[in-house]
Protein backbone atom coordinates (compact mmCIF):
# COMPACT_ATOMS: atom_id res chain seq x y z
CA UNK A 1 0.00 0.00 0.00
CA UNK A 2 2.84 2.38 0.87
CA UNK A 3 4.51 1.79 -2.51
CA UNK A 4 1.36 2.89 -4.38
CA UNK A 5 1.13 6.32 -2.72
CA UNK A 6 3.76 8.08 -4.89
CA UNK A 7 1.99 6.80 -8.02
CA UNK A 8 -1.33 8.13 -6.78
CA UNK A 9 0.22 11.52 -5.98
CA UNK A 10 1.84 11.68 -9.42
CA UNK A 11 -1.44 10.81 -11.09
CA UNK A 12 -3.15 13.67 -9.27
CA UNK A 13 -0.40 16.22 -9.96
CA UNK A 14 0.29 15.40 -13.61
CA UNK A 15 -3.00 16.68 -15.08
CA UNK A 16 -2.63 20.01 -13.24
CA UNK A 17 0.95 20.43 -14.46
CA UNK A 18 -0.10 19.71 -18.01
CA UNK A 19 -2.98 22.22 -18.03
CA UNK A 20 -2.35 24.83 -20.74
CA UNK A 21 -1.86 28.48 -19.79
CA UNK A 22 -4.64 30.66 -21.12
CA UNK A 23 -3.50 33.59 -23.30
CA UNK A 24 -3.83 36.95 -21.49
CA UNK A 25 -5.93 38.65 -24.19
CA UNK A 26 -9.34 37.17 -24.95
CA UNK A 27 -12.09 38.23 -27.34
CA UNK A 28 -15.16 38.13 -25.10
CA UNK A 29 -17.59 37.39 -27.92
CA UNK A 30 -15.72 34.34 -29.28
CA UNK A 31 -13.45 33.17 -26.47
CA UNK A 32 -10.45 33.29 -28.80
CA UNK A 33 -7.20 34.03 -26.97
CA UNK A 34 -4.06 35.88 -28.03
CA UNK A 35 -0.57 36.28 -26.59
CA UNK A 36 -0.28 39.98 -27.47
CA UNK A 37 -2.67 42.91 -27.33
CA UNK A 38 -1.88 43.84 -30.92
CA UNK A 39 -2.72 40.39 -32.24
CA UNK A 40 -6.08 40.60 -30.49
CA UNK A 41 -6.74 44.06 -31.92
CA UNK A 42 -5.81 43.10 -35.48
CA UNK A 43 -8.17 40.12 -35.33
CA UNK A 44 -11.14 42.46 -34.89
CA UNK A 45 -10.53 44.21 -38.23
CA UNK A 46 -13.65 46.32 -38.93
CA UNK A 47 -15.85 44.49 -36.44
CA UNK A 48 -16.98 45.12 -32.89
CA UNK A 49 -15.37 43.35 -29.94
CA UNK A 50 -14.46 43.46 -26.27
CA UNK A 51 -10.89 42.43 -25.46
CA UNK A 52 -10.63 41.08 -21.90
CA UNK A 53 -7.16 41.53 -20.41
CA UNK A 54 -5.82 39.32 -17.62
CA UNK A 55 -3.96 40.86 -14.67
CA UNK A 56 -0.31 41.61 -15.36
CA UNK A 57 2.32 44.14 -16.38
CA UNK A 58 2.64 44.31 -20.16
CA UNK A 59 5.48 45.84 -22.15
CA UNK A 60 3.37 45.93 -25.29
CA UNK A 61 1.48 48.43 -27.43
CA UNK A 62 -1.15 48.39 -30.17
CA UNK A 63 -2.54 50.36 -33.09
CA UNK A 64 -6.30 50.10 -33.66
CA UNK A 65 -6.91 50.83 -37.34
CA UNK A 66 -10.63 50.00 -37.55
CA UNK A 67 -13.70 48.66 -35.84
CA UNK A 68 -15.20 49.40 -32.43
CA UNK A 69 -13.14 47.93 -29.59
CA UNK A 70 -13.53 47.87 -25.82
CA UNK A 71 -10.26 47.24 -23.95
CA UNK A 72 -11.32 45.93 -20.54
CA UNK A 73 -9.26 44.77 -17.57
CA UNK A 74 -10.79 41.62 -16.08
CA UNK A 75 -10.03 43.17 -12.68
CA UNK A 76 -9.90 47.00 -12.75
CA UNK A 77 -6.47 48.35 -11.81
CA UNK A 78 -4.69 44.99 -12.20
CA UNK A 79 -3.57 45.55 -15.80
CA UNK A 80 -0.61 47.85 -16.47
CA UNK A 81 0.88 48.80 -19.82
CA UNK A 82 4.33 50.10 -19.04
CA UNK A 83 7.01 51.91 -21.02
CA UNK A 84 6.29 50.65 -24.56
CA UNK A 85 4.82 52.80 -27.34
CA UNK A 86 3.76 52.22 -30.94
CA UNK A 87 4.71 54.59 -33.76
CA UNK A 88 6.65 56.70 -31.27
CA UNK A 89 3.31 57.91 -29.86
CA UNK A 90 1.52 55.89 -27.18
CA UNK A 91 0.74 52.49 -25.73
CA UNK A 92 -2.67 52.58 -27.43
CA UNK A 93 -2.86 54.41 -30.77
CA UNK A 94 -6.55 54.58 -31.62
CA UNK A 95 -7.90 55.36 -35.07
CA UNK A 96 -10.82 53.00 -35.43
CA UNK A 97 -14.51 53.81 -35.47
CA UNK A 98 -14.66 53.94 -31.69
CA UNK A 99 -12.83 52.82 -28.56
CA UNK A 100 -13.48 52.25 -24.86
CA UNK A 101 -10.69 51.79 -22.32
CA UNK A 102 -11.84 50.41 -18.97
CA UNK A 103 -9.84 49.70 -15.81
CA UNK A 104 -6.33 49.90 -17.32
CA UNK A 105 -3.17 51.55 -15.94
CA UNK A 106 -0.65 53.28 -18.25
CA UNK A 107 2.77 54.11 -16.83
CA UNK A 108 6.20 55.34 -17.91
CA UNK A 109 5.49 56.46 -21.49
CA UNK A 110 8.30 58.52 -23.04
CA UNK A 111 9.20 59.17 -26.67
CA UNK A 112 11.71 61.31 -28.53
CA UNK A 113 9.34 64.19 -29.37
CA UNK A 114 8.26 64.60 -25.73
CA UNK A 115 4.66 63.45 -26.23
CA UNK A 116 4.74 59.86 -24.99
CA UNK A 117 1.17 59.06 -23.90
CA UNK A 118 -0.89 56.24 -22.53
CA UNK A 119 -3.49 56.87 -25.24
CA UNK A 120 -3.22 58.71 -28.56
CA UNK A 121 -6.69 59.16 -29.99
CA UNK A 122 -6.64 60.04 -33.69
CA UNK A 123 -10.01 58.98 -35.13
CA UNK A 124 -13.25 57.79 -33.56
CA UNK A 125 -15.11 58.45 -30.34
CA UNK A 126 -13.36 57.51 -27.12
CA UNK A 127 -14.57 56.59 -23.64
CA UNK A 128 -12.06 56.14 -20.81
CA UNK A 129 -13.18 55.00 -17.37
CA UNK A 130 -11.56 53.63 -14.21
CA UNK A 131 -8.13 54.18 -15.77
CA UNK A 132 -4.83 55.54 -14.44
CA UNK A 133 -2.16 57.50 -16.30
CA UNK A 134 1.07 57.70 -14.34
CA UNK A 135 4.58 59.15 -14.61
CA UNK A 136 4.62 59.78 -18.35
CA UNK A 137 5.16 62.74 -20.66
CA UNK A 138 1.43 62.85 -21.43
CA UNK A 139 -1.70 61.03 -20.32
CA UNK A 140 -4.18 61.28 -23.20
CA UNK A 141 -3.31 63.16 -26.40
CA UNK A 142 -5.32 63.58 -29.55
CA UNK A 143 -6.42 65.85 -32.32
CA UNK A 144 -8.71 65.37 -35.32
CA UNK A 145 -10.86 67.86 -37.29
CA UNK A 146 -14.07 65.91 -36.75
CA UNK A 147 -17.03 65.96 -34.37
CA UNK A 148 -15.29 63.51 -32.08
CA UNK A 149 -16.88 62.75 -28.71
CA UNK A 150 -14.50 62.00 -25.86
CA UNK A 151 -15.62 61.00 -22.35
CA UNK A 152 -13.24 60.50 -19.41
CA UNK A 153 -14.71 59.29 -16.12
CA UNK A 154 -13.42 58.10 -12.74
CA UNK A 155 -9.79 58.18 -13.83
CA UNK A 156 -6.49 59.35 -12.30
CA UNK A 157 -3.75 61.47 -13.89
CA UNK A 158 -0.52 61.81 -11.88
CA UNK A 159 3.09 62.65 -12.63
CA UNK A 160 2.37 63.91 -16.15
CA UNK A 161 3.44 66.80 -18.38
CA UNK A 162 6.66 68.49 -19.44
CA UNK A 163 7.90 71.74 -20.94
CA UNK A 164 11.65 71.08 -21.06
CA UNK A 165 11.99 68.02 -23.31
CA UNK A 166 10.55 69.51 -26.51
CA UNK A 167 9.67 72.82 -28.18
CA UNK A 168 6.02 72.53 -27.15
CA UNK A 169 4.77 71.45 -23.75
CA UNK A 170 3.04 68.15 -23.01
CA UNK A 171 0.04 68.00 -20.67
CA UNK A 172 -1.88 65.48 -18.58
CA UNK A 173 -4.76 65.74 -21.08
CA UNK A 174 -4.42 67.55 -24.42
CA UNK A 175 -7.27 67.15 -26.90
CA UNK A 176 -8.43 68.99 -30.00
CA UNK A 177 -11.49 68.25 -32.14
CA UNK A 178 -14.69 69.76 -33.52
CA UNK A 179 -16.94 67.90 -31.07
CA UNK A 180 -16.88 67.67 -27.29
CA UNK A 181 -14.84 66.54 -24.31
CA UNK A 182 -16.41 65.45 -21.01
CA UNK A 183 -14.26 64.88 -17.91
CA UNK A 184 -16.03 63.72 -14.75
CA UNK A 185 -15.17 62.36 -11.30
CA UNK A 186 -11.44 62.19 -12.05
CA UNK A 187 -8.32 63.16 -10.13
CA UNK A 188 -5.33 65.22 -11.29
CA UNK A 189 -2.23 65.51 -9.14
CA UNK A 190 1.56 65.80 -9.00
CA UNK A 191 1.91 67.41 -12.44
CA UNK A 192 5.45 67.71 -13.83
CA UNK A 193 4.89 70.47 -16.39
CA UNK A 194 2.35 71.92 -18.80
CA UNK A 195 -1.36 72.15 -18.01
CA UNK A 196 -3.46 69.54 -16.28
CA UNK A 197 -6.24 69.85 -18.88
CA UNK A 198 -5.81 71.61 -22.25
CA UNK A 199 -8.73 71.46 -24.69
CA UNK A 200 -9.14 72.94 -28.16
CA UNK A 201 -12.79 71.94 -28.61
CA UNK A 202 -16.06 73.87 -28.98
CA UNK A 203 -17.90 72.22 -26.08
CA UNK A 204 -16.62 71.05 -22.71
CA UNK A 205 -18.07 69.47 -19.58
CA UNK A 206 -15.64 69.33 -16.66
CA UNK A 207 -17.44 68.39 -13.46
CA UNK A 208 -16.85 66.76 -10.05
CA UNK A 209 -13.07 66.45 -10.47
CA UNK A 210 -10.18 67.01 -8.07
CA UNK A 211 -7.10 69.03 -9.10
CA UNK A 212 -4.40 68.77 -6.42
CA UNK A 213 -1.29 70.70 -7.46
CA UNK A 214 0.24 70.64 -3.97
CA UNK A 215 3.11 68.41 -5.14
CA UNK A 216 3.16 69.74 -8.68
CA UNK A 217 6.41 70.99 -10.21
CA UNK A 218 6.78 73.44 -13.12
CA UNK A 219 3.05 73.24 -13.83
CA UNK A 220 0.86 75.84 -15.52
CA UNK A 221 -2.94 76.13 -15.55
CA UNK A 222 -5.42 73.66 -14.13
CA UNK A 223 -7.71 74.11 -17.16
CA UNK A 224 -6.65 75.83 -20.37
CA UNK A 225 -9.22 76.54 -23.11
CA UNK A 226 -6.86 78.39 -25.49
CA UNK A 227 -9.38 78.87 -28.32
CA UNK A 228 -12.47 79.39 -26.17
CA UNK A 229 -15.37 76.99 -25.52
CA UNK A 230 -18.91 76.76 -24.23
CA UNK A 231 -20.24 74.24 -21.73
CA UNK A 232 -19.94 73.66 -18.00
CA UNK A 233 -17.12 73.69 -15.44
CA UNK A 234 -18.69 72.88 -12.08
CA UNK A 235 -18.26 71.19 -8.70
CA UNK A 236 -14.51 70.76 -9.09
CA UNK A 237 -11.98 71.25 -6.29
CA UNK A 238 -8.67 72.97 -7.00
CA UNK A 239 -5.58 73.38 -4.83
CA UNK A 240 -2.75 75.33 -6.46
CA UNK A 241 0.78 74.54 -5.34
CA UNK A 242 3.88 76.67 -4.97
CA UNK A 243 6.21 75.22 -7.65
CA UNK A 244 4.45 76.77 -10.65
CA UNK A 245 5.88 77.76 -14.01
CA UNK A 246 2.77 79.90 -14.58
CA UNK A 247 0.81 80.66 -11.42
CA UNK A 248 -1.41 83.47 -12.73
CA UNK A 249 -4.67 81.58 -13.32
CA UNK A 250 -6.60 78.42 -12.47
CA UNK A 251 -8.95 78.44 -15.50
CA UNK A 252 -7.87 80.40 -18.59
CA UNK A 253 -10.17 81.08 -21.55
CA UNK A 254 -9.19 82.16 -25.07
CA UNK A 255 -5.51 82.93 -24.50
CA UNK A 256 -4.49 82.05 -28.08
CA UNK A 257 -7.55 82.62 -30.30
CA UNK A 258 -11.32 83.08 -30.41
CA UNK A 259 -11.93 80.06 -32.62
CA UNK A 260 -14.98 78.96 -30.63
CA UNK A 261 -17.65 81.13 -28.97
CA UNK A 262 -17.27 81.41 -25.21
CA UNK A 263 -20.46 83.32 -24.41
CA UNK A 264 -22.40 81.45 -21.77
CA UNK A 265 -19.56 79.19 -20.63
CA UNK A 266 -20.78 78.39 -17.12
CA UNK A 267 -18.28 78.19 -14.27
CA UNK A 268 -20.00 77.57 -10.94
CA UNK A 269 -19.97 75.67 -7.63
CA UNK A 270 -16.21 75.09 -7.73
CA UNK A 271 -13.81 75.30 -4.77
CA UNK A 272 -10.38 76.88 -5.38
CA UNK A 273 -7.64 77.34 -2.80
CA UNK A 274 -3.90 77.86 -2.46
CA UNK A 275 -1.58 75.33 -0.87
CA UNK A 276 -0.07 76.31 2.50
CA UNK A 277 2.78 78.77 2.05
CA UNK A 278 1.68 80.04 -1.38
CA UNK A 279 1.62 83.84 -1.20
CA UNK A 280 0.92 84.84 -4.81
CA UNK A 281 -2.58 85.83 -5.85
CA UNK A 282 -3.81 84.12 -9.04
CA UNK A 283 -7.13 84.68 -10.78
CA UNK A 284 -9.61 81.84 -10.55
CA UNK A 285 -10.84 82.69 -14.06
CA UNK A 286 -8.57 84.59 -16.45
CA UNK A 287 -10.46 85.58 -19.60
CA UNK A 288 -8.96 86.67 -22.91
CA UNK A 289 -12.14 86.07 -24.91
CA UNK A 290 -14.01 89.18 -23.71
CA UNK A 291 -17.20 87.13 -24.09
CA UNK A 292 -19.97 87.22 -21.45
CA UNK A 293 -19.05 84.15 -19.41
CA UNK A 294 -21.67 82.78 -17.02
CA UNK A 295 -19.68 82.77 -13.80
CA UNK A 296 -21.77 81.69 -10.84
CA UNK A 297 -20.91 81.33 -7.17
CA UNK A 298 -17.57 79.65 -6.49
CA UNK A 299 -15.87 79.12 -3.13
CA UNK A 300 -12.48 80.85 -3.25
CA UNK A 301 -9.82 80.59 -0.59
CA UNK A 302 -7.65 83.42 0.71
CA UNK A 303 -5.50 84.98 -2.00
CA UNK A 304 -7.53 83.70 -4.96
CA UNK A 305 -9.02 86.52 -7.06
CA UNK A 306 -12.34 85.68 -8.68
CA UNK A 307 -12.00 87.05 -12.21
CA UNK A 308 -9.55 88.86 -14.43
CA UNK A 309 -9.92 90.18 -17.99
CA UNK A 310 -6.72 90.06 -20.02
Q: How should these model regions be labeled?
A:
Residues 10-18:
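Hydrophobic h-region of N-terminal signal peptides that target proteins for export
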Residues 19-22, 42-47, 63-65, 94-95, ...:
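Flexible, charged surface loops at secondary-structure boundaries
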Residues 21-59:
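Acidic Gly/Asp/Thr-rich repetitive segments characteristic of extracellular carbohydrate-active
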Residues 28-35, 50-52, 62, 66-114:
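Right-handed parallel beta-helix/beta-spiral solenoid domain characteristic of secreted/periplasmic
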Residues 279-310:
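Leucine-rich solenoid repeat scaffolds
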Amino acid sequence: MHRLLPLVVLALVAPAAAAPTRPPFTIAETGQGFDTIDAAVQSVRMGTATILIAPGIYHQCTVQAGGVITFKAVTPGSVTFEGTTCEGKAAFVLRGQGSTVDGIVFRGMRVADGNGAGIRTEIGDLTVRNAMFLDSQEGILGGHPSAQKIVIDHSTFAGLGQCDQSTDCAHAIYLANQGSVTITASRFERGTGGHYVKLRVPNVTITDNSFDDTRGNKTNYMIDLPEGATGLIARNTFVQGRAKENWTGFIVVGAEAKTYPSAGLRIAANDARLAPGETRSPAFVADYSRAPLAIGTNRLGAGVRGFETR
